């Protein structure tokens, strides 16, 4: 089995405020480590369950947040920006059997996450056919374009709820509950 994982930082456990996601900030390192730890935990579990090959796409900012040195064997990490239009899903094609998302968050303009946005912080919100578009929705449609099912999502409680509207059978793990500019975070150890 071949698995594609797209990872972001805003939905990872503990991450609450925008500055925590920026490399130039002193607090950033611990949240990048949490992102790495969550990716490694999912990769380890998938490999133990019999997955043969995993490709992880670092999808946050400049896409160099995940520590490549921490990746298990049989995992390929795509770092950096390719300039490809499928962005957070770069590397996905029809040869994959499943897609997982790690660290995802509510869409732009949604009060369910203090870090809600869609692709960029520059928009109030993006709509598709009258529905607020999240990165989850955008990337799930990308996966569908290649015929690859989306099976797992971790992130804030709101994106976990919204994901079930599009993919009812998806398995989700909530890392936090956002309320306006705050988040009720579960222990990062619980998420891993």
Task: Give the residues covered by each predicted segment.
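N-terminal glycine-rich phosphate/adenylate-binding segment common to multiple enzyme folds
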Residues: 79-122
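Extreme N-terminal starter segment of soluble prokaryotic enzymes
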Residues: 1-4
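Short catalytic helix/loop segments, enriched in acidic residues and glycine
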Residues: 19-44
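Active-site rim beta-loop-alpha module in soluble metabolic enzymes
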Residues: 142-192
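Glycine-rich nucleotide/cofactor/substrate-binding loop typically near the N-terminus or early
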Residues: 39-94
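Structured catalytic-domain cores with a bias toward divalent-metal coordination
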Residues: 6, 39, 44, 48, ...
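Active-site glycine-rich loop that binds ribose-phosphate moieties when present
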Residues: 84, 120-146, 155
């Amino acid at each position: 089995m071949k698995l594609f994982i797209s990872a972001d930082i805003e939905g990872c456990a503990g991450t609450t405020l925008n500055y925590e996601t920026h490399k130039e900030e002193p607090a950033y390192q611990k949240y990048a480590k949490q992102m790495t730890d969550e990716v490694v935990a999912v990769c380890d579990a998938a490999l133990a369950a019999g997955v043969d090959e995993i490709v992880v796409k670092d999808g946050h900012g400049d896409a160099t947040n995940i520590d490549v040195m921490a990746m298990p064997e049989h995992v390929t990490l795509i770092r950096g920006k390719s300039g490809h239009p499928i962005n957070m899903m770069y590397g996905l094609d029809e040869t994959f059997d499943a897609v997982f998302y790690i660290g995802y968050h509510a869409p732009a303009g949604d009060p369910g996450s203090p870090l809600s946005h869609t692709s960029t912080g520059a928009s109030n919100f993006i709509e598709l056919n009258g529905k607020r578009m999240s990165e989850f929705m955008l990337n799930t449609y990308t996966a569908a374009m290649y015929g690859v099912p989306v099976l797992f999502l971790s992130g804030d409680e709101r994106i976990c709820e919204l994901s079930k509207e599009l993919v009812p059978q998806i398995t989700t793990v909530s890392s936090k509950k956002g309320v306006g500019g705050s988040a009720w975070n579960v222990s990062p150890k619980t998420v891993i």
